[in-house]
Amino acid sequence: MMFEYPFMRWNYCPISISLVAALAINAMPSRAATFGTVVPIAGSASDIALDQSRGLLYIANFTANRIDVMSTADYSIRSSMNVAPQPAALAISFDSQFLLIAHYGNFTAPQTSQNLVTLINLNNNTRQTFATGDPPLGVAFTADGEALIVTTTGLVLFDPISGAMQVLATFANLGQSLPTALATFPSQVISAALSTSGDGSTVYGIANSASAQAFYRYRANGHQLYAIGIVAVPTPLPRVGVAADGSWCMIGQYRLDPSAIDLAQFPNSVTSTTIGGVAVDSKAGIIYAQILTASPQTTTSAIPSTTPAATATPATPPVLSILDADNLTVRDTLSLPENIVGRSVLTAAGDVLYAITESGVTVLPVGKLNQYHRLAASSSDVLALGSFCNRAVITQNLTIADPGGGHTDFQIASNATGVTISPPSGITPATVQVSVDPNAFQNQNGTVAVPLTITSSTAVNLPPAVRLLVNTRNPNQRGTLMDVPGNLVDILADAARSRFYILQQDRNQVLVFDGTTYQQITALRTSTTPTQMAMTFDQKYLLIGHDNSQVAYVYDLDSFQQQTSITFPPGHYPRSLAASGNALLALSRNVATGGPGMIDRVDFVSRTATALPSLGIFVNSVNPAGVLTPSPNGASILVAMPDGNVMLYDASADTFTISRKDLTSLQGPYAASSYNSYLIGNNWLNAALVPVGTLETASGTPSGFAFVDQAGFRTTAPASTSPGVIERVNQNTSVNPTTMAEAPLLPTTTMPFVRTLAPLANQSAVISLTVSGFTVLPWNYDAAVAPPQIASVVNAADGTKPVAPGGLISVYGQQMSPVNIATQEVPLPTALGESCLTVNGIAVPMLFVSSQQINGQLPTNVNGNATMTLRTPGGISDNFYFSILSAAPSIFRTGTAGPETGLATVFRDDNGELITPTNPIHPNDIITIYATGMGATSPPVDSGMPAPANPLPNTVIAPDVTLGGVPLNILYAGLVPGEVGVYQVNASVPSGVPEGMDIPLVVAQAGSSTALSVRVVK
């Protein structure tokens, strides 16, 4: 049989470890239940082959020298086939006729090396053995009936009908000798894997040794072989999964195209030759994977120039990640009973996954996940908004459900003081109340992120923690909070379309927002771990760079359609991009030589990038954590690096004209203007990149900066839990520093440079990435607002000065509220229209606010000499001092009778009408008086709460009511049920009261009294 091999191609394709650390809030909780059934075998499984036509799974028992045969119906080991020593790899032909077994007998003297393959005809159980010369590492059939054999020194094509073998390629010896050390898995000895696409057209494979690695792709049609040398950091896990049509594959933690371009890689992965596995269901767009990851990076402020090939210990518990096939976004995470240590095989329907695990084989019915207990929360975030004045408990609802509709137990907990959850456990579906006591966060005026962990004794998945965001702000803190879950790392305004874009790194997508409504329009998918966005100079396309992909994504901004990606040189990860008037550049993390980063130039027409041979007169060697940003006029591109280096690309000269290092380190915001000014961190740079000014540092760590003409906006914060500060700045001064509702996002260890500020082109608002998501600040956020002033405090019934606890009051002054707002909300709010009052530090429930008057209720627990303070967006008023009596009765003057208004609220029970000269009091009448300021009640009623009807809250101090000096019999004195701060006195009129037009009706209590004149007739 003759074979033609049209070409052999060797590429150098480095792949690197991800450098993105996981958020602490997403830490996995401890597990109880696991997913999958373990089928132990007496020996060590080295490979499996699925025979669906017979309902069997063949298991290569490497140490027991046999093939164990498992029923896929009941998972029992039905039989075993004794074979030659060390069965290492298996493959079954597409017609299910042949089972091919590779025997790895690479023993050293004095033992005999037996390197061969066994071919079993499954239709008639006949066997043949064929010597391979060199030890075989793996085997795979293609749809044409032939098999590919990889040995320690090359690739061989095998015809099972004739037994002919043809060497396709040779490479450096990848073999390991036997015997091996104790406690060694077969995958550590063989360290190779290959797999065929579902259509049988393509085989992908990898083989490793301590010093070499081979990656190859074989196309059965035309017998085309592509051999590609990989230098990978970390070394790819020797597991292979292939798309059904052979158009891409997973080699361990790496998703590769046919040319070995790294399209996506699992973040933060580390070297492992033993633990882990992958399986591809390309029809469903899913990858199943166990990939070991490193601990979050916390000790450095910048990405190192050389990435270590870290090695992790086995994860506890072992987990199976369900990933989106295009960009490896995690859909769900399942607890495994034990680690995967070899091949994983999916059924043709994709409903069952068989994997080699530590005890033998584990069966994972992935198509029946809805029949297993799982948990999911209805929201990633719970937002609790309070204020300095609103100290009432804030309650939000969160639904816990089983995605399959089942009834699953759950526990939800928080370790934060002031946070309670009710119920803390239960059975799904369930709605829990998350209650936050703002008093526990009274020292914070920003946003505190509190993880709510969800666990279960029966759920097989590990739901991520829910982020509880507690914001307690003062009225003078500016901005409207918009909750956006996830790890947000970049923002970019689109002037041409009145939009802005936010990069959501953990979900691998760009969120598109309307610049007028601030509502999300759509989401654009990216590759893995997106780091920065850029627009082409013509503003037509959006570009996205990544830390875990060797391509940059491209989107048409008018249609939102994804375009052909930009492919970068092998080993280059485009973390930052920028477009000038004549060049599109990228700063790439370069692992081709294990060295620093490089600047690449992009040919946008061909969608390819090429490393610049030099940066003008300077060597092309930059810090991989650096960033690029263009001037809006396209004249230049600024390069900023955390080690203090700065560079400038001049578009007119088409070269790098400046390279300086005046500072030892840099981090924070970065920006370039159209007026030859630049900003990095706190440093203002001139056209020569010479520092000519330093911005103030007292307000905290710099976060965002954006030039507007020759000045700019800037945000800072001392900590993520503090309120942020936004200010207008120029080279030498900061103007009008204004407190924000919460902190802007601050630099991190893996993202030393941040872009968090986006002024909208129509100058309507400034958008800042902040702790909760983003904050909308009006363009005139710092417009002058006069501070509030308090002039007087009176009771709200008749406008006199005596006031008492629990009574309704009117506060008069100036600049008391920017708006007029009345509320019927119950309980009464303690913040209304961005204004709030406190008395002795206790918030006042409010009914109405305006520029010159506020109506509210004095707190029930204040007395004596008091201090009132008003907070508004204009600031905090001077202290106003007044006295609070234990009782200060005052009758309302809000009655209306015909054309008469402002009447005292005293009613005759006989007809239910107001007492007037035409509806006078008669002896033996029962009258009802409505008043305020009558003090404490029994039982007590909380401030701002309506009075109950049962039991009735009676006044603690009984009032005296006289009519013309004659005492009236008090039937009831207390709060009106359903009302706040309104008291009712029911009294009977004796027969001996005097008659007249102006008989004094007096209500006296605790030395204070109120009086009015009424008409009394017989």
Predicted regions and their residues:
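Blade-level signature of beta-propeller repeat domains, shared across WD40, Kelch, NHL, RCC1
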Residues: N339-Y372, T748-A784
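A short beta-strand motif characteristic of beta-propeller blades
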Residues: A33-P40, S76-M81, N125-A131, A164-F185, ...
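Repeated scaffold domains used in trafficking and secretory/extracellular systems
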Residues: S44-A49, Q86-I92, D134-D144, N173-G198, ...
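Hydrophobic beta-strand positions that form the internal "hydrophobic ladder"
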Residues: L57, L99, A147-L148, V203, ...
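A sequence-level detector for low-complexity, Ser/Thr- and acidic-rich stretches
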Residues: W779-K1018
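Short glycine/acidic-enriched loop and turn motifs that connect beta-strands
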Residues: A64-R66, G105-P110, G154-V156, N208-A212, ...
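Feature for long, exposed domains in two main contexts
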Residues: G367-R478
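Short loop/turn segments that connect beta-strands within beta-propeller blades
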Residues: S71-Y75, N121-N125, D159-G163, R219-H223, ...
